Curated annotation (Swiss-Prot):
The gene is leuC. Keywords: 4Fe-4S, Amino-acid biosynthesis, Branched-chain amino acid biosynthesis, Iron, Iron-sulfur, Leucine biosynthesis, Lyase, Metal-binding. One of its GO terms (biological process) is L-leucine biosynthetic process. This is 3-isopropylmalate dehydratase large subunit. Its EC number is 4.2.1.33. It comes from Caldicellulosiruptor bescii (strain ATCC BAA-1888 / DSM 6725 / KCTC 15123 / Z-1320). PROSITE patterns: ACONITASE_1, ACONITASE_2. Catalyzes the isomerization between 2-isopropylmalate and 3-isopropylmalate, via the formation of 2-isopropylmaleate. It catalyses: (2R,3S)-3-isopropylmalate = (2S)-2-isopropylmalate. Pathway: Amino-acid biosynthesis; L-leucine biosynthesis; L-leucine from 3-methyl-2-oxobutanoate: step 2/4.
């Protein structure tokens, strides 16, 4: 009889062909998907070519998504994308997504059904942890490991300890998944889950949509975590059946599995939360912000909050209102399909009428890449995941993080505020 294991331990053990793994074990495991983007894949390609083989391990289990500097922002990014494009063509990579069919990688892969419960996914991007929302073990790696995995289908792992988050209660008002994860990071700190698995369970999951869960899992790395993972429930299965035909395997933590820490969180008590510069742990609830913080730019989108539910909330708030004069509001649907759905539901017209600019799917300003760089001294409120010094532009600029609801309301107000200041209650239709 094996010892009790957490969700992450079970997935790693299964893919390593072992009955049991424990925290600290170094293992080699078979991966179900290897992911890269236009920034990390060129380095991986160079390393892959040094190996001297003429094929990848499985052309169906590699996904390459140019999303960071696309559409090409300059000659260097154009050259990188060309290299990636040629590699994908040479090795007949099935899941290469060109401009026009692409999206931000961590929104695109679940939408395309490429990740299902029980999968082991690695990606040369730190926010690969997003897929834990589906009950998969997913984590970021470097380009060298990506190269080796493309060649062998394997990667090495150090089995992480786990922190258990038991969620109960229901979301209230304008609170969203973004507020829950900002609350958690504010509570444990940016290194509070260092190299650990953040595992979510409890009856509070019923109150969280899949988009909420993607947001929460996405920001596990902002707490230093190896991965974030949700217990699979009916909502997970419904989502997977809508998007994928791949077989899946559900791994449930044993009742007596060991955790380094256990937190019980009543999500009904969490209020809309804002992370102040220059760390995601510098959080205040909207009620604790006593001064008016005037902002120059609002960004709604990214792999954290660019999904249809996020745009729906933003449109609800911006409908019939105008962006404050002198403020820039940029909206990035996370994928082409999300863009199409937003068009169908009339959101794009609402955004344009409000004075926003709507962009093609791209990581763009989140990493200070393009499409909305901040100047010296400017302040931005963004639904992205990081607010480090210089993250979105000039080293003297400042980035605040929030949910789409707070971001949209702030775009109208001109300062960081809530939809409640516009006379809107969270349960309004």
């Amino acid at each position: 009889m094996t010892k009790p294991m957490t969700m992450s331990q079970k997935i790693l053990a299964y893919h390593a062909g072992k009955e049991y793994v424990e925290p600290g074990d170094l293992i080699f495991a078979n991966v179900d998907l290897v992911l890269g983007n236009d920034v990390t894949t060129p380095v991986a390609i160079k390393e892959f070519e040094k190996i001297g083989i003429d094929r990848v391990f499985d052309k169906d289990k590699i996904a390459i998504v140019p999303d960071h500097f696309t559409p090409n922002k300059d000659i260097k990014s154009a050259q990188q994308c060309k290299m990636v494009r040629e590699f994908a063509k040479k090795y007949e990579i099935t899941n290469y997504f060109e401009v026009g069919e692409m999206g931000i990688e961590h929104a695109l892969l679940p939408e395309k059904g490429l990740v299902v419960p029980g999968d082991l996914v690695i990606g040369a991007d730190s926010h690969t942890c997003t897929y834990g929302a589906l009950g998969a073990f997913s984590t970021g790696i470097g380009s060298t490991d990506m190269a080796c995995a493309m060649a062998t289908g394997k990667c090495w792992f150090k089995v992480p300890e786990a922190i258990k988050f038991i969620l109960y209660g229901k979301k209230t008002g304008w609170t969203s998944g973004k507020d829950i994860i900002l609350h958690i990071i504010g509570m444990i700190g940016v290194d509070g889950a260092l190299y650990k698995s953040m595992e979510y369970t409890g009856e509070g999951l019923k109150s969280l949509s899949m988009d909420d869960r993607f947001t929460i899992a996405n920001m596990a790395i902002e707490a230093g975590a190896k991965n974030g993972i949700f217990e699979v429930d009916e909502k997970t299965i419904e989502y997977v059946k809508q998007h994928s035909t791949k077989p899946y395997k559900i791994f449930k933590a044993d009742e007596d599995a060991e955790y380094s820490q256990v937190f019980e969180i009543d999500i009904s008590k969490i209020r809309p939360t804002v992370a102040f510069p220059h760390l995601p742990e510098n959080t205040k609830t909207i009620d604790e912000i006593t001064e008016k913080i005037y902002i120059d730019q609002v960004v709604i989108g990214s792999c954290t909050n660019g999904r249809i539910e996020d745009l729906r909330i933003a449109a609800k708030i911006l409908k019939g209102r105008k962006v404050k004069k002198g403020l820039r509001c940029i909206i990035f649907p996370a994928t082409q399909n999300i863009y199409k759905q937003a068009l169908k539901e009339g959101f794009i017209e609402i955004f344009i009428d409000a004075g926003c600019v709507v962009s093609t799917p791209t990581c763009g300003p989140c990493l200070g890449g393009h499409m909305g760089i901040l100047a010296d001294g400017e302040k931005a409120l963004a639904t992205t995941n990081r607010n480090f010094v210089g993250r979105m532009g000039h080293p003297n600029s400042e980035v605040y993080l929030s949910s789409p609801a707070i971001a949209a309301a702030s775009a109208v107000l001109g300062y960081i505020g809530s939809p409640e200041e516009l006379g809107m209650k969270g349960d309004e239709e």
